[in-house]
């Protein structure tokens, strides 16, 4: 049924569809389903936390229209916050590692936000440090996606229950999500574990920065994943296992899914699908594996992910 008109674009965040992968999954493997979070109005899963963090601050009297928001972001949270701020009448300033794609930078500017780039070698730590400096210098409000409880909470209240509704009458045997802030994994994982006590919750992290696995942080190309530290928004008790994914592996899977499934997905989505397929092979036929595709491939057309010689 078609949705009724809404008063504000933020009202259409959530309610994203789920699609079964048909061509990239082996016949003897479990069914793999992907939740298309890039169908949110700002183009990514981060729209959910952007609205949740702003509305929490409004309820607590921390911000009013005309105020300025500052946030360190690898891109998608910034884009979510930028469009929510534009819709609600706030100004926005974002600090971001210089290694992030040109599309991400341009999208932030298109929504009227100011962008401050930090050294790529410092990863998200550099962006976080710069945001703190700007906050202290100008008195800006910082939502702090890596610490804000509204982040995992919105996934517990929306994304998780949506999956329960979408899979009503079925059992989800494994749920996987890439860990950036860990909000999706923590919030959805909590809901699904309550409904399916035997479910396996799997964290996905970059092979080149295996911090969750006890390794050292390092530079990697899986934009949005692997912040280089364990965020306060990640419930480390919620996941049962970790799958590490390499840069090239994630990119190859993103390209395959575009060509073989008609789903144009971002780099972290490629990592999620690769990990989900590995888990599906392990579980075998008759089981159900679900993952989340955080963002759309159009956000990466200037990156090596979708650069073509001809």
From Swiss-Prot:
Keywords: Amino-acid biosynthesis, Cysteine biosynthesis, Pyridoxal phosphate, Transferase. Pyridoxal 5'-phosphate binds at residues 76, 180-184, 268. Pathway: Amino-acid biosynthesis; L-cysteine biosynthesis; L-cysteine from L-serine: step 2/2. It catalyses: O-acetyl-L-serine + hydrogen sulfide = L-cysteine + acetate. One of its GO terms (molecular function) is cysteine synthase activity. The keyword Nuclease does not apply. It comes from the Bacteria. The keyword Nucleotidyltransferase does not apply. It is an enzyme of class 2 (transferase). Its EC number is 2.5.1.47. GO terms for biological process: cysteine biosynthetic process from serine. Its cofactor is pyridoxal 5'-phosphate. Pfam families: PALP. The modification N6-(pyridoxal phosphate)lysine is found at residue 46. Homodimer. Belongs to the cysteine synthase/cystathionine beta-synthase family. This is Cysteine synthase. It comes from Staphylococcus aureus (strain Mu50 / ATCC 700699). The lineage of its organism: Bacteria, Bacillati, Bacillota, Bacilli, Bacillales.
């Amino acid at each position: 049924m078609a949705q009724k008109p809404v008063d504000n674009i933020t009202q259409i965040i959530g309610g994203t569809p789920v699609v079964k992968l048909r061509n990239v999954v082996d016949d003897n493997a479990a069914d793999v389903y992907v939740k298309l979070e890039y169908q949110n109005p700002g183009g990514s899963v981060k729209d959910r936390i952007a609205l949740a963090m702003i509305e929490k601050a409004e309820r607590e009297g921390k911000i009013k229209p005309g105020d300025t928001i500052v946030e360190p972001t690898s891109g998608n949270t910034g884009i979510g916050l930028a469009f929510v701020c534009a819709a609600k009448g706030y100004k926005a300033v974002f600090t971001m590692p210089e290694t992030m794609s040109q599309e991400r930078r341009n999208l932030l500017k298109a929504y009227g936000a100011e962008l401050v780039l930090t050294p790529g070698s410092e990863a998200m730590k550099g962006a976080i440090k710069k945001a703190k400096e700007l906050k202290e210098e100008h008195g800006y409000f910082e939502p702090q996606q890596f610490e804000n409880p509204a982040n995992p909470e919105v996934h517990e209240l929306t994304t998780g229950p949506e999956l329960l509704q979408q899979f009503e009458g079925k059992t989800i045997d494994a749920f996987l999500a890439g860990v950036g802030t860990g909000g999706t994994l923590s919030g959805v994982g909590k809901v699904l574990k309550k409904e399916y006590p035997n479910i396996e919750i799997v964290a996905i992290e970059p092979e080149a920065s295996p911090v969750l696995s006890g390794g050292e942080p390092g530079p990697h190309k899986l934009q949005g994943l692997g912040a280089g530290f364990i965020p306060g928004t990640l419930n480390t008790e919620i996941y049962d296992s970790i799958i590490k994914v390499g840069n090239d592996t994630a990119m190859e899977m993103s390209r395959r899914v575009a060509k073989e499934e008609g789903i144009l997905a971002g780099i972290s989505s490629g990592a999620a699908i690769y990990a989900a397929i590995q888990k599906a092979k392990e579980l075998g036929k008759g089981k159900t594996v679900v993952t989340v595709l955080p963002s759309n491939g159009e956000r990466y057309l200037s990156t090596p992910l979708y650069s073509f010689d001809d």
